[in-house]
């Protein structure tokens, strides 16, 4: 399952590691070091999935604020949150705000890949379900 993924993290090494891991699996990736750049990239071309770090230095908003912005504009965009300083409360807050899931750094590559695959699959199924519901009244009308 190939997708276009935006990676937002203030640490270049983390962005590169995630990007290489995903590219090795056939995904196309784009990287942003802060919320401002992420918003610009999202506005230009919404991806299939976004991976957002919660704590970003030198950014005009943190990952939870960016998540709120993303969900306000792209409510169906799957978002996976990552953090090296996360707590259970932070993870719960992110999921309540619409994140698909939360991964704590450091993480294993296979865990990241599984989360990305599951988030993209859930998004695809939600989209297909909405399309079927939209067609259902047409198909059930008597001739």
Which residues does each predicted region cover?
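Flexible nucleotide-interacting loop at or near the entrance of a catalytic core
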Residues: 111-143
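Active-site beta3 strand of CheY-like receiver
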Residues: 45-51, 56
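Charged docking surfaces used in two-component/phosphorelay signaling
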Residues: 16-24
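C-terminal output helix
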Residues: 87-89, 103, 107-117
């Amino acid at each position: 399952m190939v997708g276009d993924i935006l990676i937002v993290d203030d640490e270049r090494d983390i962005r590169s590691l995630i990007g290489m891991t995903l590219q090795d699996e056939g995904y196309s990736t784009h990287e942003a070091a802060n919320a401002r750049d992420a918003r610009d990239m999202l506005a230009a071309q919404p991806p299939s999935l976004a991976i957002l770090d919660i704590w970003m230095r030198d950014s005009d908003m943190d990952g939870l604020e960016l998540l709120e912005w993303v969900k306000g504009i792209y409510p169906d965009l799957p978002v996976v949150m990552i953090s090296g300083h996360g707590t259970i409360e932070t993870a719960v807050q992110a999921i309540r705000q619409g994140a698909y899931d939360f991964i704590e750094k450091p993480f294993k590559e296979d865990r990241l890949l599984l989360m990305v695959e599951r988030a993209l699959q859930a998004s695809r199924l939600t989209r297909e379900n909405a399309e079927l519901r939209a067609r259902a009244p047409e198909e059930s009308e008597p001739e």
